[in-house]
């Protein structure tokens, strides 16, 4: 018989988890103003809030940390990292930063001016925040297929070429660059096809524009190209990554995802003028150019992590666990953004809690119910995260309202996936008893989901 799939690693160190009572969780979430970001980690049993910086490093990464060069200038660890990034992406100019949003801050400080228009595919929260905080506008050009969570198409993260062309045809002079998020987190961790990257490149060239990849999960995107797109089944993940980046002019990276580290990020580009411009903001915001807010040991671990994760065995293990959880939800009839993405399950809260109006934030309500049910912490990717329109100050209800359940890399077993699925089933089975949601009692102007205060209705 054919041998079943198994993880590409064995476990060397473990961390205990603490269970809690329903009564404790009801009190804790109330004290947190019904914002799961405000919970303490020891109040959480299985943490699916994010996959950013929450993964486990390998023994080789830990070994590399012992060799980290902590020199302020000219760190050997930086040059090791730079060599690895250039080998994978083809980008010669590299600036390290302490995380992905810092990379955006440094690069966008150089490129984004008031009144600018930045088209792309579902800009994530920090990306949109850095654009809108500069009095510029993020224009979503994602394909319409992404709006139908039950539609099975392989690349729902794609940029719609017609939408992109329309923006450029009408307002090209206001566009500093095009941004493509791989994978498309806000749309459900959905991948972008290689063909679509070529199309975006061709449109950019037509109008003389450059392309940036928001690359936090670029390896997951490469895996889906390997698995779903014709002509790539015989390619290595590194070969697919190299072709992907050949269609970009630069990238921002949160290394806390596909870099397999707990902290770090970087900017990389093929253009010296972008590098020279970003340098001016790296030094005052992040630090000197050969550390940029990162320790030498963290740069050393990141270099190893990037190399490890761009091997098929590593990334396949990661994706298969997310697919395992998706199969359990299929068994229970729970709707999520299909097909399942690379780093998380995105439960369609509008379908689960269809009796709760959008003004009462169904996805946040579902996240609260799941936490109370089993101590599983998820994250709303929906109407609260969307923030208010920067001009009208009205809530933006036009997109999807999803409960994201991120799976940390190399951390949980499939038994934990079974717990998550069973807890969701319990909530799903009593969904008709959940008739009211939450209201906002305090919020910030940008990226409100991190600190918003809510009340149950």
Region spans (language model):
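Short, conserved charged micro-motifs
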Residues: 276, 354-362, 410-419
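Flexible, glycine/charged-enriched surface loops at secondary-structure junctions
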Residues: 289-296, 316-318, 333-340, 381, ...
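Conserved glycine-rich beta-strand-loop-beta hairpin in the small C-terminal domain of fold type I
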Residues: 322-323, 337-349
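Short glycine/threonine-rich loop-to-helix capping motif typified by GTGT followed
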Residues: 192, 346-361, 390-396, 449-455
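Conserved PLP-enzyme active-site core in the AAT-like
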Residues: 2-34, 38-55, 61, 70-94, ...
């Amino acid at each position: 018989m054919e041998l079943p799939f198994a993880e590409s690693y064995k476990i060397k160190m473990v961390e205990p988890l603490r269970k809690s009572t329903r009564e404790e969780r009801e009190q804790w979430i109330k004290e947190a103003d019904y914002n799961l970001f405000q919970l303490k980690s020891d109040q959480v049993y299985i943490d699916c809030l994010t996959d950013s910086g929450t993964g486990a490093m390998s023994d080789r990464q830990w070994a590399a940390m012992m060799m980290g060069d902590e020199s302020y200038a000219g760190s050997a660890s930086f040059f090791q990292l730079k060599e690895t990034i250039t080998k994978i992406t083809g980008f010669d100019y590299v600036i390290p930063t302490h995380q992905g949003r810092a990379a955006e801050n440094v690069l966008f400080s150089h490129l984004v001016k008031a009144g600018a228009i930045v088209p792309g595919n579902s800009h994530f929260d920090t990306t949109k925040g850095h654009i809108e905080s500069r009095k510029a506008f993020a224009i979503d050009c994602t394909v319409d297929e992404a709006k139908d969570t039950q539609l099975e198409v392989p690349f729902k993260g794609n940029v719609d070429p017609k939408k992109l062309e329309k923006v450029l045809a009408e307002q090209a002079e206001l566009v500093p660059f095009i941004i493509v998020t791989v994978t498309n987190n806000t749309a459900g961790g959905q991948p972008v096809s290689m063909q679509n990257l070529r199309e975006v490149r061709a449109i950019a060239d037509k109008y003389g524009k450059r392309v940036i990849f928001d690359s936090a999960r670029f390896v997951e995107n490469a895996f889906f190209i390997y698995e779903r797109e014709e002509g790539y089944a015989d390619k290595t993940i590194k070969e697919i990554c190299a072709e992907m980046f050949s269609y970009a002019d630069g990238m921002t990276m949160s290394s806390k995802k596909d870099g397999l580290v707990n902290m770090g990020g970087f900017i990389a580009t093929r253009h010296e003028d972008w590098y020279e411009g970003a340098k001016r903001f790296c030094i005052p915001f992040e630090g000197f150019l050969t550390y940029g807010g990162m320790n030498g040991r963290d740069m050393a671990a990141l270099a190893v992590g990037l190399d490890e994760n761009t091997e098929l065995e590593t990334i396949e293990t990661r994706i298969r666990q997310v697919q395992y959880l998706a199969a359990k939800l299929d068994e229970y009839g729970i709707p999520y953004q299909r097909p399942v993405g690379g780093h998380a399950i995105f439960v369609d809260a509008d379908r689960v809690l269809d009796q709760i109006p959008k003004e009462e934030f169904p996805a946040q309500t579902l996240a609260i119910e799941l936490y109370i049910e089993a101590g599983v912490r998820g994250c709303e990717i929906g109407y609260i995260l969307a923030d208010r329109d920067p001009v009208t100050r009205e809530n933006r209800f036009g997109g999807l309202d999803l409960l994201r359940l991120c799976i940390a890399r190399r951390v949980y077993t499939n038994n934990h996936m079974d717990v998550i699925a069973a807890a969701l089933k319990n909530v799903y089975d009593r969904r008709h008893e959940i008739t009211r949601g939450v209201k906002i009692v305090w919020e910030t102007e940008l990226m409100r989901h991190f600190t918003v205060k809510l009340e149950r209705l």
